[in-house]
Amino acid sequence: FQMLHSEIMTIMQERQKVNILIFDNCGFGCINNLEMNHGIGSLATEFRYTDGKKPTGDLIPVDYAKIGEGYGLKTYTCHTIEELVNALEDAKKQDKACLFDLKVLPKTMTDGYESWWDVGIATTSEKESVRKACEGVLKGREEARVY
């Protein structure tokens, strides 16, 4: 969502009834998973305050519902399943786009995805974890279908 939310303007221009669900895990969780699985650690994919040099402080809270309000959407912030169920029921009654700011725990993404993603990785590194991840990437490339 933070990478590109200009689609909301198009939704509003066209008066479309769209439900937008944002799973707020305090970062780019999918990219963080890729980094961690490739042995390189997090490269600022968690939204944290810095100590002046590195983002190692507390997580930065973002109120995505307020961003949606700024665009004129009906918004909901949900911390529990019950809040989400109630918000979904209310959203059915709305005649405009709705945004759901779903507060989830960091690092609670679905693992695996039952697929393979060819992500570039260093072929030489001082870190054993990167060298091992590189072996996995090279093996995956050998097994990948050519289209």
What residues fall within each predicted segment?
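Thiamine diphosphate
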Residues: 1-147
